[in-house]
Design a protein with these regions (language model features):
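Membrane-embedded alpha-helical segments of transport systems
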Residues: 36-44, 63-72, 83-102, 131-133, ...
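Membrane-embedded hairpin module used as a gating/binding unit in multi-pass transport
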Residues: 93-167
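Entry/N-cap segments of selected transmembrane alpha helices
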Residues: 24-45, 197-223, 274-278
């Protein structure tokens, strides 16, 4: 079991090596949207508990709302959930369905006028030293706030440090391609062993899929409502759709938000703002996973 968890953590090195935190560092306010868009996780945990799942299983199911397949699998493995296979299928299925789910969720809580809001993009310059220091600082801060998250965030940030240091290009390329692809393949094979028909084709699986969908929808709605709340206090309004990009499905969610903005009004470019929020969601989802592990472990 320990080796399985280790394999999953290695995948975060590959993910970290793929991420450019530049759009986020040039607009630090986007950190808030990544945090706000994790609301669905905790809402789904409550729903799963009310539906009769054990706390460890409910916590694992709720993490589907992180819109992050590796985090969902890792948390369910650490919590020793009985539904690892169903959770993995739900997490990756809904990640693929982001272009269908998110527009529906966004339109539920926004008006056409809000979706047409233009945002100026004037990023601050981000130095190489800042990009190198960022993963180190994040790991230290997360370690102080939520030590249980370091196992996840540390690997993610280590991968990003390999990318940004500028002297380990071959390692960076390997992490982004060979390592990520190999671990993904091994991950799929490992999960498949827990997906026997008698253990997978059950009513519980349908319930998990349903709760996962609720988590995804409420993630998007939570981010949008947070953006609308912020707009009450600022002069230069934020397009509320940016809040929905705070989930971890990178870069799919940012593309969906930009596509919707263009459909509402041609020439409305909010892609870089959406990417900043989307990158923030990558960090926030991993931290949320660590927090859930810590909080639930205290009651088991």
């Amino acid at each position: 079991a320990a080796s399985d968890v280790y394999k999953r953590q290695l995948l975060f090195i590959g993910i970290g090596a793929m991420i450019d935190f530049g759009p986020l560092l040039s607009q630090p306010v986007m950190f808030l949207f990544g945090a706000a868009a994790q609301f669905g996780i905790f809402f789904a945990i409550c729903v799963a508990t009310l539906m009769g799942f054990d706390l460890k299983d409910a916590a694992s199911i709720g993490i589907i709302g992180a819109a992050d397949g590796p985090t969902s699998i890792l948390v369910s493995q650490i919590m020793r959930s009985d539904y690892v296979g169903a959770i993995a299928v739900a997490a990756y299925s809904y990640m693929a369905l982001v272009p269908i789910i998110q527009p529906f969720a966004i339109r539920l809580v926004t008006t056409k006028k809000e979706r047409q809001i233009h945002m100026t993009y004037s990023p601050k310059a981000v130095s190489r030293s800042t990009k190198i220091a960022f993963p180190i600082i994040v790991t230290i801060i997360v370690g102080l706030i939520s030590p249980a998250s370091v196992a996840l965030v540390g690997f993610l940030m280590f991968g990003n440090l390999i990318r940004e240091c500028g002297v380990l290009q071959s390692l960076s390329d390997t992490a982004q391609n060979e390592l990520a692809n190999l671990i993904t393949l091994l991950l799929g094979i490992t999960i498949s062993f827990s997906m026997r028909a008698d253990a997978f084709v059950r009513v519980d699986t349908l319930m998990i899929m349903g709760i996962g969908l609720v988590a995804f929808i409420f993630d998007s709605i939570g981010g949008v409502l947070f953006a609308k709340f912020i707009n009450l206090f600022i002069k230069n309004k934020i397009n509320p759709m940016i809040g929905a990009a705070g989930i971890s499905a990178f870069p799919m969610s940012a593309r969906v938000v930009q596509k919707m903005a263009s459909e509402e009004e041609k020439g409305n470019i909010i892609l870089m703002h959406a990417v900043g929020a989307n990158v923030s969601g990558q960090i926030a989802s991993v931290i949320a996973g660590g927090l859930v592990i810590k909080l639930v472990s205290q009651y088991l």
